[in-house]
Amino acid sequence: MKLVMRNRRLFHAGLWCRRAGWLTSAISLLCAIALFLSWHQDEVVLRQEAMAITENLNTDSARIHAVNNWVYHNKGFASNDRYFILPALGPTPIQVMERGGDCSDKSRLVAAMLNSIGIHAGLVMISPCLDCGFIHTVVEAQYENRRMVVDPIWNIDYPTGDGGFLGVMDLAGTSRGRERIVELQHQRPATDKIASIPEMDAMFDYAVAMNWKKNIVTQTAVFILRLNGYQPEFFFRPRLLEDPKLLLAIMLTIITIIAAIGGYLLEIGLRFVMMRIPRRMTCSNADKLGATDG
């Protein structure tokens, strides 16, 4: 009788584990779908605005320049304190479009708008030294099989003089960034914002798209990537890291999968325990009977 009751409790526990897993999975999935739809609506707005800005332009470099120029003139430059659900994730690109922001906020908007029209772009963080903290953020975007840097806080790009533009790797270890600042300061009025730009904002010696030294996880990822022949320093910063809605939607999708599989595995584990208990009891009873007969 005790064995039957124990098996019954284990059976119901397994059933509840599965149901709890499915319920958690269903809730997470619904939230993920809602977030994805909200992100998609934002994406439509960004794409429409970016297409309007670049309507008559024929090259990606011209489109990148135009979007950067538009974001520079859109709203103010104070840090955007808005956020979506989690303050640590910062504002969404739409929130930056509505209220402006600092270098990281406006760079987030530029990258999102460029990605929405099919131009690969990502944020790049600038540091004054190898072990120093990050002091500025810009955007690096791909154009005609090359890359170019744009800065939506100072409205800067870095032309080569022959129709091309410079990317992070082209600017690193050179004085081209500082030379470009001096050039623009002479071209623009003395009252222009660029008159107050810190020199370090245009130095790319320690600029990175990802802080690969952040922790053991990122360091391991770098090791694995290099082991497989990849060069992480050439990767664009993942888009989901700069879009809170997209990041949360993906995280909830992962939770959905884990909850569904986890509940099912717990039920299987409890059933396995149920199958083991009768065998042990049978063996124990057989030993007792053998001893009695003896």
Regions found by a protein language model. Name each.
Residues 1-53, 293:
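Linear, non-domain "peripheral" regions
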Residues 156-158, 162-234:
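Extracytoplasmic/lumenal ectodomains and periplasmic regions of secretory and membrane proteins
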Residues 104:
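Soluble catalytic regions of membrane-associated enzymes that act on cell-envelope
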Residues 21-34, 233-294:
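C-terminal single-pass membrane-anchor helix
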Residues 108-182:
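Hydrophobic/aromatic-rich core segments of domains that either
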Residues 2-11, 19-22, 139, 143-147, ...:
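Short flexible/disordered coil segments
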Residues 32-101:
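Secondary-structure boundary elements
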Residues 2-17, 216-249, 277:
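Membrane-proximal basic amphipathic "stem/tether" segments
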